[in-house]
């Protein structure tokens, strides 16, 4: 089915991105014979259409920066793919889809080193700007703690549409594969993420970010919990 034929309300929703479609099709190709692939992809498309028809309509469409590559609607498409193909796709393959959407932008920023005060402060300003955008749409409710030179950067989301969608439609079990990319993205900036909870299994998603040479990292070792989330003690 052509993307243009999908019956979604484009006045408030957006289509999954082209890179997201490419990643999903690659996984379908990996697991299904050629004669079945088109049918499987159409099932994913129809599931996407169906669930969006039952989903909130206030996320800003194309105007909201959270709805681009790797954002809210791509996460929804990935969950729809998981729903159709959960019997064959692995957890690691689900992680790879989100990584391949998010990490290319961070790889271009390898020169950034959060151990250095200049870059750390610049990152804080970027998060503060993101909070202003979130305040416009009230999709991801974001709160950034005031900057302190001697402490890690801290912010949190107390609302996350992707987590809300997962819990509403029964995809909470695969959310770790989508959330773990936050760790990988920070590592490309010589930074470390320290996290203890998410909006899926708690009331907030916390982000404590410091340089990868900061002693704070050793004080909060990382582990994977029983659900697959990367977390810290």
Where are the regions that the model predicts?
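N-terminal, charged low-complexity regulatory/assembly segments
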Residues: 1-82
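A short, structure-level motif marking secondary-structure boundaries and short turns
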Residues: 65-67, 166-169, 224-225
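Amphipathic interaction/junction segments at domain boundaries or subunit interfaces
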Residues: 70-168
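Short, hydrophobic/π-rich interface segment
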Residues: 141-201
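Short, charged/polar, Gly/Pro-enriched secondary-structure boundary elements
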Residues: 162-164, 212-219
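Short, cationic low-complexity segments
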Residues: 184, 222-233
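C-terminal edge-of-domain segments
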Residues: 196, 202-212
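N-terminal functional module detector in eukaryotic proteins
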Residues: 206-208, 219, 225
